[in-house]
């Protein structure tokens, strides 16, 4: 939530914790022993999360579509939501993502703004993971902005500045 507050100080925020107990921490979906995405689990969990987000927005009187902000596992889930629930989000900021699904998105994302920020020294991702996702989302029609920073996996002040500036330009 601290990152979301930095990115959009005056915006309403909904903090969501994944339901998968990772001990320590939580995730939005299971990973295989080799750390690859369990696509079947992700495909099952994404619609449930989408329903939760829609219900929460309605309950709190949030009329505008939300912009997802996700880091790592959360960025992968946010990308999955874009690909499977195209009317849910107004856009997304994805820090250190990778492809949620090996297949192309099944829906069009015509003009949906997406910011992807990768870390060149990220040892938890393979080089080009974020670029692959950017290509896939662009192919589906999303308006993708991509940045590669000389950093590792952790979110930095530069990430926050890029995300905040991107949101201000979009004025969502």
What are these regions (language model features)?
Residues 65-110:
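Primarily recognizes the serine-hydrolase "nucleophile elbow" in alpha/beta-hydrolase
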Residues 17, 69, 95-96, 117, ...:
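Alpha/beta-hydrolase-fold catalytic nucleophile elbow
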Residues 1-64:
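Serine-hydrolase catalytic machinery in alpha/beta-hydrolase-like enzymes
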Residues 64, 109-114, 140-142:
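Short, proline-enriched alpha-helix->beta-strand connector loops that line the catalytic pocket
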Residues 115-118, 122:
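Short beta-strand/loop motif that positions the catalytic acidic residue
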Residues 131-172:
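C-terminal catalytic histidine-bearing segment of alpha/beta-hydrolase fold enzymes
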């Amino acid at each position: 939530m601290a990152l979301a507050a930095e990115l959009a100080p005056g915006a309403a925020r909904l903090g969501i914790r994944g339901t998968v107990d990772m001990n320590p921490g939580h995730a939005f979906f299971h990973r295989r022993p080799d750390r690859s995405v369990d696509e079947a689990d992700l495909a099952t969990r994404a619609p449930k999360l989408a329903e939760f987000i829609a219900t929460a927005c309605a309950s709190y009187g949030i009329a505008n579509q939300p912009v997802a902000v996700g880091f790592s596992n959360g960025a992968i889930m946010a990308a999955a939501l874009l690909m499977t629930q195209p009317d849910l989000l107004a856009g997304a900021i994805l820090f250190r993502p990778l492809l949620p699904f090996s297949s192309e998105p099944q829906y069009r994302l015509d003009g949906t703004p997406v910011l992807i920020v990768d870390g060149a020294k990220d040892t938890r991702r393979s080089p080009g993971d974020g670029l692959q996702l950017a290509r896939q989302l662009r192919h589906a029609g999303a308006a993708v902005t991509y940045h590669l920073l000389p950093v590792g996996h952790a979110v930095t002040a530069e990430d926050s500045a890029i995300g905040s500036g991107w949101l201000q330009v979009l004025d969502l």
